[in-house]
Amino acid sequence: MTKPTFYITTPIYYPSDKLHIGHAYCTTIADTVARYHRAKGEDVFFLTGSDEHGLKIQRKATEMGVTPIQYVDEIIANFKLLWQRLNITNNDFIRTSEERHHKVVQSILQKIFEQGDIYKKNYEGWYCVPCESYWLERQLVDGKCPDCGRPVERMEEESYFFKLSKYQDRLLEYIETHPDFIQPVARRNEMINFIKQGLEDLSITRTTFDWGIPVPFDNKHVVYVWFDALLNYFTGIGYGSDPEKFNKYWPANLHLVGKEIVRFHTIIWPIMLMAMGEELPKQVYGHGWLVVEGDKMSKSKGNVIDPLALIDEFGADAIRYFLLREINLGSDGNFSRDALITRINADLANDLGNLLHRTVSMIEKYHGGVIHKTACSDPLDDELIALVNETVAKYQDAMDHMEINTAIKALWALISRANKYIDETGPWLLAKDPAKAARLETVMYNLAEVLRIVAILTSPYIPSTSPKIYTQLGLTAPEQFLLADTAWGGLPDGTKVQKGEPLYPRIEITESGETVIAATKKTAPAAKQAVKAEVKAEAKTESKAAATEEITIDDFMKIDLRVATILTAERVPKTDKLMKLEVRIGEEERTIVSGIAQHYTAEELIGRNVIVIANLKAAKLRGIESRGMLLAASDGEGKLVLADAPDIASGSKVK
């Protein structure tokens, strides 16, 4: 049976400067969509590339004393490196300087010229070099380019023109009768209004520079950048050289572009296709811009983010997840390091990473690492399984409509529900009752099965993480995760888990602004002295416990005692007594450092419901801010016993 095809493209990037996070944003979106459609079982072709011609490139190369091709070659190598580091799965990388592309452009230009849709005349107007665009006086904004706001240059030259105006009414009718052609809706409305103002014929050749594709019918001219660049979508799938491949993938399912170039893709490109007698792409989606800390990226502001450095610091999957989760695709999005670290710690480390760690740890502890598929159901199980099925449906609907962060939110709601399911079922209590052995097996299976399905659904977003989840569950990750495998019950009986390293260690920011892995954080000498002082103060307080001053009921009422669920536990490095705990108090998560490391192992603590003082003033212990204190009693031999609340919901007030 022939697979459905899905052809997706990014814009081809202009190699005029260094890489920035915006390049990573658009290509990560496209890769995610491509991976999703592969997971649906479709035959996907994913094209990206570089737009290498034009006056701007020629000027840059001249400034640097190199040829244009030498100038762009180095930048293109960095593009390809970035795509590799981000795990981008493009099928081809098209360069407009390649001979295969020159042939396509020249053959199409000749065809349109011969049918009378191209004519020559002298042209005078205002030219924006960075945008490679001519503008009329009335189109300028305060005398500057209406697209980028930069100064324009007055130019006059002989040029060939393409008859955009001839196809204006036909294009407008097409857009109005095909509501999905331009998305989101705001971009569609902008383009309709633009066309209704009247289209000018388009200058498509230049004589003022020679770094471009020669015009086949007049060797004094080279092809204007946009008429050249847009045809990459044909070259990449074999137009003129591989008819079978071209007919297989055209028309494109999705052109993903930044909002600033929607006009070129929804006016010039479809009119070119109409003139060629070719079908139009099914959709052009204009995503928003990525700003940094609320400001547009610029070298003058010093806020251009290097994506390669970011990947070195946080890892590709964390960057991909943040870009996809944090930003509504059709709107502008804000990048900040604080928001990135918050997402890593809250979503990836606490929610997903902790669910896997707790589940695998309990399967090892209670069942020797073996997953048992036992039928001992409970209404809680039915609710969880129903949510899984509902989530898969919501996820697919959102992804099909390019609502990527909506799909991720639905998926993380399932992850949160699975974490809550642990608290509700209390595996540590079931393990104490031999009569509930079958129930414990069912709970463990359900948690592992949720994680298996989560691994499949997250594979388009965090593709390096999904195989790690499979490995820890004792499964072999497939070469291609498939949505068809998300049906409940696919985890085989008898599977043996393989506990591994945390998926995402928590990230902390030092006082100097450096990021460190929480588990390996080193304490500076000054901080060590502060900790010693804090410990001495605590010891003095404890020694005077018997003679503590009496308090009133009003004093006692100031103490906010709450039930908290311990999410993660790890020893504080270079200490014997301190344990760093991540706890959930209702909907809030916080860190508490407690001196219980000699009395409980991390495994014994994870998943436990304990009582904490929730309104204790924050204090730093070993450089870690602790917000709260666990209640525990001490026996005659000095052993600490925690005040547990196993059957009370997290966040409940203790009175």
Regions found by a protein language model. Give the residues of each.
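Helix-rich, typically C-terminal accessory recognition domains appended to large enzymatic cores
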Residues: 120, 326, 331, 339-377, ...
